[in-house]
């Protein structure tokens, strides 16, 4: 079964806050749900499908009850930061098969305000965490290996932050709005060699939500039509053989699956929302998705190709996780939201991509250097 053209994004909402000390996580989920419903012109009584991940307090049953929903389909797939891209694909499958007709997907949390639970579980706790396999260290290891294999430099990685900051200056809700230079990035404190502080994403409270529905319903609503035409997902772990190669991610599998279903190529894409937990995350995904050859990512970004109005592939025009928002340490939701804004023509005029009719939203979840998931969505303006 193909989901091509079967599901439309009728509502989007990104919470404007980046710091919410006086709100509960459940309240944030309710606020983003309300915002997406208002964007679509619907009410909660219209929802018959609900999707959430590990950030939802009490899980899917508790959230359905708290939000006052009556659903006939639900999904709580948990794959870290790319969960919401996975949910979009799964919602499209549910809609295509008649399991539901209007799905709500929510993300919310407070990592900036409240304590985060320990990340390591299972095999990680027993065999990896004790040896210093923290998030920053693992991504630093990936960056170092990429440099060793392909000659990538810290200055090239810095161009990704520069592009993100160029876009963030136009986003009134971005956490960091100051435009930075390559020198600024290289002069920021070292966090995990070779990654500097400015190579790392922000930590923010907040969240976001999506409304996904059928073509018939979407055409009856108020927003410009945007549909999902391709989706792919994959998991990569460290067990055996080539899986130990730190220079590629599960995007090498999820990307081609999404492009094949959509019937398009990387060269057709007008705008890219690329997961940016760290600058190295972006570089690896650009290569793995086919926007440049493996090993050429450094030159691709240093040529300014990610800057809207200048480059070949404008990316993360809201400022992304590097500058604007990385709610709950999970950036997949905001990647979809900004892609939809671009396709609707609702991005900030200074960063709006002209005639944007085809976009990609891609994310990862987990740790690139150990085990992680990837999910790729190809979106089209109708």
For the regions a language model picked out, list residue spans one by one:
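Active-site ligand-binding patch in enzyme domains
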Residues: 211
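Conserved "HGTGT" condensation-loop signature of ketosynthase/thiolase-family condensing enzymes
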Residues: 1-79, 93-97, 104-201, 208, ...
């Amino acid at each position: 079964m193909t989901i091509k053209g079967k599901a439309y994004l009728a509502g989007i909402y990104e919470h404007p806050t980046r710091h919410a000390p006086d709100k509960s996580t459940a309240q944030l989920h309710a606020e983003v749900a309300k915002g997406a419903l208002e964007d679509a012109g619907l009410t909660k009584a219209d929802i018959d499908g609900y999707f959430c991940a590990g950030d939802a307090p009490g899980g899917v049953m508790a959230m359905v009850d708290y939000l006052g929903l009556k659903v006939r389909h639900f999904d709580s797939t948990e794959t870290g930061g790319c969960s919401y891209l996975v949910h979009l694909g799964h919602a499209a499958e549910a809609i295509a098969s008649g399991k539901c007709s209007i799905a709500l997907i929510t993300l919310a949390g407070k990592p900036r305000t409240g304590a985060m639970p320990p990340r390591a579980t299972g095999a990680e706790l027993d065999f990896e965490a004790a040896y210093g396999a923290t998030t920053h260290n693992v991504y630093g290891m990936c960056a170092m290996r990429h440099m060793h294999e392909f000659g990538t430099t810290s200055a090239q990685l810095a161009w990704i932050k520069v592009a993100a900051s160029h876009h963030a200056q136009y986003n009134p809700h971005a956490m960091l709005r100051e435009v930075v230079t390559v020198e600024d990035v290289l002069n920021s404190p070292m966090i995990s060699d070779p990654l500097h502080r400015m190579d790392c994403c922000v930590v923010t409270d907040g969240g976001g939500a999506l409304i996904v529905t059928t073509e018939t319903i979407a055409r009856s609503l108020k927003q410009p039509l945007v549909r999902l035409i391709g989706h792919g997902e994959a998991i990569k772990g460290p067990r055996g053989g080539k899986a130990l190669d730190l220079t590629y991610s599960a995007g090498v599998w999820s990307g081609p699956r999404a492009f094949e279903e959509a019937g398009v190529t990387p060269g057709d894409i007008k705008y890219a929302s690329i997961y940016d937990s760290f600058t190295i995350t972006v570089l690896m995904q650009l290569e793995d998705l086919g926007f440049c050859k493996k090993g050429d990512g450094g030159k691709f970004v240093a040529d300014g190709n990610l800057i809207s109005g200048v480059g070949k592939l404008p990316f993360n025009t809201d400022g992304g996780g590097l500058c604007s928002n990385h709610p709950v340490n999970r950036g997949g939701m905001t990647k979809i939201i900004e892609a939809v804004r671009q396709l609707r023509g609702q991005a900030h005029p200074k960063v709006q991509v002209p005639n944007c009719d085809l976009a990609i939203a891609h994310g990862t979840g987990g740790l690139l250097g150990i085990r992680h998931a990837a999910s790729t969505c190809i979106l089209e303006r109708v």
